[in-house]
Curated annotation (Swiss-Prot):
It comes from Acinetobacter baumannii (strain ATCC 17978 / DSM 105126 / CIP 53.77 / LMG 1025 / NCDC KC755 / 5377). Formation of pseudouridine at positions 38, 39 and 40 in the anticodon stem and loop of transfer RNAs. InterPro entries: PsdUridine_synth_cat_dom_sf, PsdUridine_synth_TruA, PsdUridine_synth_TruA_a/b_dom, PsdUridine_synth_TruA_C, TruA/RsuA/RluB/E/F_N. This is tRNA pseudouridine synthase A. Homodimer. It is an enzyme of class 5 (isomerase). It catalyses: uridine(38/39/40) in tRNA = pseudouridine(38/39/40) in tRNA. Pfam families: PseudoU_synth_1 (PF01416). Its EC number is 5.4.99.12. The gene is truA. The active site is at D53.
Amino acid sequence: MQRYAVGIEFSGIQYRGWQTQQPGVASVQETIERVLSKIADEPITLHGAGRTDAGVHATNMVAHFDTNAIRPERGWIMGANSQLPKDISIQWIKQMDEEFHARFKATARRYRYVVYNAPHRPALLHKQVTHIYQKLDVQKMIKAASKFEGTHNFETFRAAACQSNQPVRHVKHCRLFEHGRYLVLDIQADGFLHHMVRNIMGCLLEIGQGMYEIDHIDAMFAAEDRKAAGITAPPDGLYFIQCYYPEQFDLPHPPLGPHWLNLPE
């Protein structure tokens, strides 16, 4: 039995998230498993580094699978991409030993959230960015983003239905910056709670709209109550861009993305 790690890029527009759902509900995981199973001529189960909500995208979702099938790495990639829908693509594949696990060996995960801040919605970026037409106080949002760095109890910033056993997470960085008409939130942590990034972005957007001051974030943390924070930002602008592992696994590091923004690494 051989274990493979794979890097996957996908648009989440047509899917109910990464994880396999009930029959008849499209998911990224199930779509890829179906294709890999045909290539391997045996059932394949993918284990992803994380889960994404419906409508959320990824530029480098890492997953692994085990198989008895013998194929060159190029054969797996070419075979899968020729059969996958155009909104899912295998970017790389690598043979691994059994010690590797896409989820449990990950040391950190990283997301970017993209806002298009302009008077009119962008037709060509439909469901690839979140459109905000109001003028935002960007400098205030930039300062507020740093409030989320460090180790905190993120109870206020997770979904009410989040199933994680405990809400404490360490955020290595949480940076917001301008890129033309785009605002980009770049956040890396040892792990994320359900809706955590979208709830943080929702908070920053409300601060940018003048609904409350930066220091109010402290009160939100202290409340440890989802009702103490504001909106959950839409899934459209959210991208899973990287998963980090110990150097011993020597996985590829493709450009972070989203590629059409041409952002610095």
